[in-house]
Amino acid sequence: MTYLKPNCSHLALLPSKSSNGHPLIARNYEFNDELEDFQLIKTIVEGKYTHMGTSVLSFGREDGFNDQGLAVTMSSCGFPVGADKCMRRPALEGLQYWAVIRSLLENCRDTREALLFLKGMPIAYNLNLILLDRSGNGALVETLDGRMAVRPLDETSPLPYLHAANHAVIQELASLEPEAMVHSLKRYDYIKSIADSAETLTVSQLKSMLLAPYPNGLCCRFYQDFFGTTKSMIIDPMDGIIELCWGGRAENGWHTYRLSDPLPASEEVISISCEPAAPDMFRFAPNPFA
């Protein structure tokens, strides 16, 4: 699916790391504005958990949370996998990320169930998948050419947060791909520097991180290079809400949606700002986790 470059950043906070005492996920998604769905969808399927998230090809999900309090976000782990000649060839027959995420949201109540569900799932896409539930248990799940590694997140973890950009950070997988794109390394280090410098983070601080321009922030405007911020979000699985900003611009507004409320059909006009990308953004550098 498409010839995108690896992109996206996300951060999960334990309740002890967030100022409101809730588990939170902050997330940016980068893509091309002409191919992005720009849809938030609430899905109610008989016999499945109700969930809300942004779509890909309308049917798939790129992120979201369900009525049991499980939230899921993703970024590519290395170069994106797909059938297009410009993409990395899949190492096995299996699922694209958008099928994985929708399956988790519809079938899993919490991080523990999601990890068990993933073990039996053939995943062809190379993923950095973040799971976080309303109880404050989470995990980073990395997949690379059919291999999987997991870093759990709970109150016994060395750090009260975890994050990912577009390279492997769990050593057993990072050693298989010892280089990463410069922009991924810079975004990862930016998140770490902010998170390590504060005892707790507020929702307002997270929003500022998401909309601050790269390289001193996470927002990218390089849409022609398939690397423009199409959506920014904060998910609170405890309260069952998502705060969503389209197009990487504060001028488009942050909108709050609660899963327990109706989601009527609506449309709005947003604006984006396009800029050329510096070529050295996409060069490779050593992955410090390899």
Predicted stretch roles:
Residues 1, 17-24, 28-119, 123-128, ...:
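C-terminal, well-structured catalytic/ligand-binding subdomain of enzymes
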Residues 1-13:
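Long amphipathic N-terminal alpha/beta scaffold segment
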